[in-house]
């Protein structure tokens, strides 16, 4: 546990963020009541009220001010944004504006030490752009807000932990993103995150970019010329790193526990195995039955975790959204915050 609040940003209030936040609060009410867990929700109070009505609950989430010296264990801070009433499931610039302002306030509070970490519910990239905020996603926005040039996305579900060399770029641009400097940064940040999670001597595997790790150069030389020497240097520096491991087998080995995390070269290479295990769909309706997994941003001066799914406008306001990913994100934020505190003591 951490003695400070976790900042929970609502994301787009027209999405399922308000609902999964209320559901998570209900599921964690025992810990909240004892003070073992403290949550500060940042977003739209009206959207919170709407979610409570949809779920038929009157759970108390009092409003507070950022300047209050003390906050109750569970409370909310109104995002510093204005706009028309936001309707569940309706994409709008106002929804994007609320999402951005909530994140901005959460970052500011966490940088100031008022909150221990920031946990983000999903935003909608189109709504964000309509509001004038042109970021590919949360990760890039947080890097901008904290003044960081390089950050790393790590997805986690159970023991399936996968960090990424590149994410929101065209596949044709991925080889250009694989440089010795970038790969070493990803390895180092992944190693540090695993140590914060309580793994004393992390073992990391690096995925190959090309089929069969390039097959001796027949299918490309990036694995031979870039990845292999970078891995060798990391090993020489005392890290436990192996690779390049062919992409068609690395995640089978990760799931079996042969190593603690994998480094993927690009978005879909890393996202597919995590979501294959963490997501389930109802074959009859096509609706999601289970949404588990956490998105962690490494390399920031603050701790940030997130759900690993989108705003789901199609089911927003219906009381059927799954909160498991948010609860996982809260758990990871606590563990990382505790690990950060331990490393400073």
From Swiss-Prot:
Enzymatic reactions: 4-O-phospho-D-threonate + NAD(+) = dihydroxyacetone phosphate + CO2 + NADH
Molecular-function annotations in GO: metal ion binding; NAD binding; oxidoreductase activity
Cofactor entry: a divalent metal cation
Uppermost EC category: oxidoreductase
Keyword match Protein biosynthesis: no
Positions that bind a divalent metal cation: 168, 212, 267
E.C. number(s) listed in UniProt: 1.1.1.408
InterPro entries documented for this protein: PdxA_fam
Cofactor annotation remark: Binds 1 divalent metal cation per subunit.
Keywords in alphabetical order: Carbohydrate metabolism, Metal-binding, NAD, Oxidoreductase
Gene3D superfamilies: Isopropylmalate Dehydrogenase (3.40.718.10)
Function: Catalyzes the NAD-dependent oxidation and subsequent decarboxylation of D-threonate 4-phosphate to produce dihydroxyacetone phosphate (DHAP).
Family that this chain belongs to: Belongs to the PdxA family. PdxA2 subfamily.
Subunit-structure text: Homodimer.
Identification of the protein by name: Putative D-threonate 4-phosphate dehydrogenase
